[in-house]
């Protein structure tokens, strides 16, 4: 097994994965199109006090490069422009009440997102084969994230994030991770 160590090796691996996905018919989406699919129009707050949550996007800065910032993104998705193209940003498939990304403020879950690290070209080929032959549940979206991939499974309806559902949803996500992150999907399986 190959363990990529340099930034240039990972960038090449990223380009190779993008080429493979394109060859296999996976269409690249623009960021606003992707997030609109996750958060359908009307599902987020469009005016104050309408009872809907917002996206909380987080930009994480490398040490010494400024402060971490959070952006509140409403149903217009206009503030997405602040984080698109950032080298390390997080936008979970959740809506939140308030202006901070905390468990207490989480309102609705729109998709299950699974992060699999250290996915090289061969591991991506393995995953695509498993999705195609039904061994693994095919995600709605497959996102290349540099050193890995994110698998997004859109929910038919958003799930309200009540405290009594936390254990069940956490267990479901852990089951997805254990099933998908293995010695055929990652250079470094999650043991």
Regions found by a protein language model. Give the residues of each.
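Chromatin/DNA-recognition segments of nuclear transcriptional regulators
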Residues: 172, 187-191
């Amino acid at each position: 097994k190959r363990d990529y160590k340099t930034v240039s090796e990972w960038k090449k691996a990223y380009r190779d994965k993008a080429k493979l996905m394109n060859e296999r018919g996976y269409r690249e989406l623009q960021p606003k199109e992707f997030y609109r699919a996750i958060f359908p129009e009307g599902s987020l707050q469009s005016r104050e006090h309408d009872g809907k949550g917002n996206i909380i996007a987080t930009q994480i800065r490398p040490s010494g490069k400024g402060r971490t910032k959070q952006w509140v993104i409403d149903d217009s998705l206009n503030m997405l422009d602040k984080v698109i193209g950032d080298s390390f940003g997080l936008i979970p498939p959740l809506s939140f009440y308030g202006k901070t990304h905390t468990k207490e403020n989480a309102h609705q879950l729109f998709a299950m997102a699974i992060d699999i690290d250290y996915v090289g070209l061969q591991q991506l080929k393995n995953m695509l084969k498993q999705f195609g032959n039904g061994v693994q549940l095919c995600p709605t979206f497959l996102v290349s994230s540099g050193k890995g991939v994110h698998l997004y499974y859109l929910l038919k309806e958003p799930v309200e994030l009540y405290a009594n559902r936390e254990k069940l949803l956490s267990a479901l996500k852990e089951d997805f991770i254990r099933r998908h992150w293995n010695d055929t999907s990652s250079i470094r399986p999650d043991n």
